[in-house]
Amino acid sequence: MCLITHSSALSKAEKPIKCYKVLIKGYGDERLTPIQKTQVPKSILLGIKTFKAEGIGILRPANWYYYATWGFEYVAEKGFIHCFKTLDGAAEAAKPRFRCEKKYRFEIWEVEIPAGTEYVEGFYRYSLMGDTSLDMLECVAAREIRYIKPMSGK
């Protein structure tokens, strides 16, 4: 799962950008970001603080896993928090695809990218091999996001 973009340049948000974040609910109260497998602190879920991306990765050129025709694209992975530009896109991406476990739960949160935060826009790629129906979901990856309110969940 990653964001694919045609630009290797980061932008800075001039004003807060509204988007939607999918959190996977694991066992107990654990909530993970699907990309980073990073547990989200409970204080974040209360809307107290912003959540900064972990990891040192920035944008890297698409490697041999991506077909040769995609060689000019870049991948935003570690160091970014991946969100969706629309609520419908977040809901589509949150559906379990290959592992339909009974304990699978998710939450979708309305979030914002604070003004001044570095971000990049692109499209969501769910899997290199498998379901390609998600390839055109509009996605934004930012260095930092602020949780606003939960929108839906299962």
Predicted regions and their residues:
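Conserved NAD+-utilizing ADP-ribose enzyme module
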Residues: M1-I81, L87-K154
